Amino acid sequence: MSKKRTIALTISAIAVALGIGAQFYTNHKIDQVLKNFPYTLDNQATLNVTQTAKNFFMRELIFSVKDSDAKSTNVISTKLTALPFFITAESQLSDQLVRQLNKTLNITIDKNTINSKFSPVGDYLQSDILTEFRDFANKSQNLSIGLHFLKNKEVELKTTLSGFNYDKDTKLEEIDGEARLVPVGANQYDLSSIDLTAKNAEVALLNGENTHVYMKNATYHFDVKPGEADKRDLSTKFSSDILRVANKSRTTEESQATAGGLNLLVKQNGVPSSINFHHEFKKLSDGSLSIKDGVNLLTKIFTQNDRFDSSLSVLSVNVPKNNQPYFNLQNAGLELKLANTDLTKANVDFKLNVESVKQTPADEERKWEAKGGKVNIQLDDYNVANELAFVPFLLDTIAEKEAPAKDNKDFLNAKDKWVKEFSGKTNIEAALKSFNMADLVLDDVSASDKTETLDNDQYNEHITLSANKASYPSAGFQFEKLAIDAPFKINHSKAHLSARFCS
């Protein structure tokens, strides 16, 4: 045997040995990964895997998901091909999942391909999912999803959807989305962030009877950051260039309320990890959310946290009547901040600013316009818990068709508790640059009301009112440089509060 042939055979033998060794290593890594299952996803679902076939180069797997109701669904069947230091996978959606998706989403899946690559050395995974389907309107749509398992163990998903007609009331066009899952423990992932954009969206809430919403160039962002002691910090942003609201009496675009340049920001710090709004929002989307459920949901969003910060701004709002301009709002914004660590001594800060607002009914005498409106409300060390205690009674009153025959003892006890524990400071300020309605004219009007509870059953109240001009000729009065300053000290404040409550 020649020397060159001997060297070549030796090199080949080394290569085969290394390849076999790498193959053993690759299979070892696959076994390690499979042992990590099941995985928990955001406390809402469990991902499991079953190995149905195996040899030195190939594995066949079935992935299944079990939801919070313990219902299990096979989602993907995968054929792994293990090469030295490299793995490829060909996958397809299970027949069970395809049938479920077709039924749930009103679609027909025509084609679906899933291609994956995985390196056991670098712990890198990339999957591309391409789906062609026909929606409710029998329109062909394309969905692409890219999944990346990053080196820091985080999971990144990117998706593009050409469009989707779910039913006659819900339609989406050109949707792009990104989501990120982060590891929070052994075999457990939580949602970290979501970003969605839509060129056009038409959504029906509460069955669309009174809340049919159209959006153009809408964006949605949500992220979660871990806080202290099993708490999380949540942030939600929403914007839409145009938002139109329709109902059964406003069916044409010309008759619908329209908001332009809408921006919403909500931050909730210190939300207990045990709280999950998923089920409540699910009720909202399918129309089963009652008024009571809705109020309870809002109460949770506002108060079940250590701090709540929110802002809402809009460039314009137009509400027509009989297809004619009727109500117009320009450049309005509000802010609400709540310090909720102790709801018996909460701090509330509310601000509202409006550049201009006007109403133009057919009757000239009823037309009015206001400019430069401002409202500031501050509550310090205020017992919000006692205020919230009346919400269930209010909801019951709304539901009752007849007045109760006798007083509700629980309500009276709540009232007595409210009077006894009433405390804190309040500061309410309002200002208006101008107001015009027929011959009523107001110019530079401002008012304030400040209160503070004191010891010995007393509290202070200070009321002010000023106006540069107030003119109403048809009523026979006109004021200029009006100023009222009225400080009070109230004795027997508990009795006064009780009487004021009943009034």
Language model: regions and residue ranges:
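Bacterial Sec-dependent N-terminal signal peptides
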Residues: M1-T6
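Hydrophobic membrane-insertion alpha-helices, especially the h-region
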Residues: I7-Q23
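Glycine-rich, small/hydroxylated-residue low-complexity segments
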Residues: F24-N27, D31-S503
